[in-house]
């Protein structure tokens, strides 16, 4: 259960026991008037709550954790996730008054968890956020590999490791009943670019900015990208401020847990940015998807309380628009350009790389796992179909 789109939630059932994988949401299509969020139908889960042993989370992106508050209000299922993912979930649950009552179990790669007839082994994978996991799920019916969102980055950023292909291959040799694999980039040939590409692309843009203030918009959960920006700010002698509620809470949490490294003498508050000349400031902000109430959107509308955008600003949108968000992103870009800023967006420079496997990485996963059955997941039907064709 849970296939056919890009916001993820799956339920595995064997011999009367059940486990859940992920609990995501998506934003509505343009024609879904009056709808703020799209969440899963939890009816089957709630009807079988006594049989559900736990909920495993692959990583901390919205399309994998965003619906947790709505499930936990009705069913306080135990959550199994990596350390950073738990931190991101807690930030989200704080907004709903649920953080103190949620039941968390921290998991790590290669440390197996047995719940009912299921034995689940977390496997490290590369993605655009630290602590991303695949799961090998052993049960009486056989072994299932659930990749979650993944790519294979052979030159990962400092602190990360290459996707654990040997463990995938080990399961392949033993025998894999089914592989459920990320289909997001199934239409793209070749390999996904390394995160190192972004570091070099953004470094060139920092030079291009000259004496202007730099504003970088990215996903608040993209801890890798935030670290890259902080490192470049230090290289160029700039102070760093963050704007946007989720960006502030996530950066604070990631620093506390040791996933984000930023010296105290580099960080300043948003209220302090005007105390420094433009060439001494980098502002990291939310709003890369043109969200109406995000910090970057408010800047584009000249309604941000602390930031007034003008000709002295060099703005980098370090993310590609999620399908369906193109118009809102364009509106924000137009607003920023109207105010006199220079804006770098989409494919103008190497400011973003995908966190998802392209066709050659998908072939590698299929070859190593060597499953009896293959279920493409995490994609629109055309992507699922292309992934099936690749297999």
Give residue ranges: language-model regions.
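C-terminal regulatory/interaction regions
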Residues: 231, 235, 254-391
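His/Asp/Glu-rich metal-coordinating catalytic cores
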Residues: 1-56, 61-276, 294-308, 327-331
């Amino acid at each position: 259960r849970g296939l056919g789109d890009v916001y993820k939630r799956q339920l595995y059932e064997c011999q009367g026991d059940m486990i859940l994988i992920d609990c995501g949401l998506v934003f509505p299509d343009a024609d879904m008037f009056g709808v703020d969020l799209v969440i899963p139908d939890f009816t089957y889960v709630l009807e079988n709550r006594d049989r559900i042993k736990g909920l495993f989370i692959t990583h901390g992106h919205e399309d994998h954790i965003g619906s947790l508050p709505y499930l936990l209000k009705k069913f306080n299922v135990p959550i199994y996730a990596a350390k950073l993912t738990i931190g991101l979930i807690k930030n989200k649950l704080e907004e709903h008054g649920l953080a103190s009552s949620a039941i968390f179990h921290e998991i790590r790669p290669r440390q197996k968890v047995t719940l009912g007839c299921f034995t689940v082994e977390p496997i490290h994978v590369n993605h655009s956020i630290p602590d991303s996991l695949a799961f090998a799920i052993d049960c009486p019916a056989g072994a299932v590999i659930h990749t979650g969102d993944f790519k294979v980055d052979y030159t990962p950023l400092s602190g990360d490791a290459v996707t654990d292909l040997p463990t995938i291959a080990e399961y392949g040799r033993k025998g894999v009943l089914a592989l459920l694999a990320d289909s997001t980039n199934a239409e793209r040939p070749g390999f996904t670019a390394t995160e190192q590409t972004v570091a070099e692309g953004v470094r060139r843009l920092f030079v291009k900015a000259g004496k202007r203030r730099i504003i970088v918009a990215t996903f608040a959960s993209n801890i890798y990208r935030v670290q890259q920006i902080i490192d470049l700010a230090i290289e160029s002698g700039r102070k760093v401020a963050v704007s946007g509620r989720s960006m502030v809470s996530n950066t604070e949490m990631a620093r506390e847990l040791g996933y984000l490294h930023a010296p105290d003498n580099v960080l300043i508050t948003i209220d302090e940015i005007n105390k420094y000349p433009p060439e001494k400031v980098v502002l990291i902000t939310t709003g890369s998807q043109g969200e109406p109430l995000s910090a970057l959107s408010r800047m584009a509308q000249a309604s941000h309380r602390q930031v007034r955008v003008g000709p002295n600003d060099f703005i980098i949108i370090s993310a590609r628009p999620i399908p369906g968000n193109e118009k809102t992103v364009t509106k924000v870009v137009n607003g920023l350009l109207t105010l006199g800023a220079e804006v770098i967006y989409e494919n103008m420079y190497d400011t973003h790389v995908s966190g998802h496997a392209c066709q050659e990485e998908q072939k590698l996963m299929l070859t190593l796992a060597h499953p009896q059955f293959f279920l493409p997941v995490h994609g629109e039907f055309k992507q699922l179909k292309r992934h099936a064709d690749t297999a």
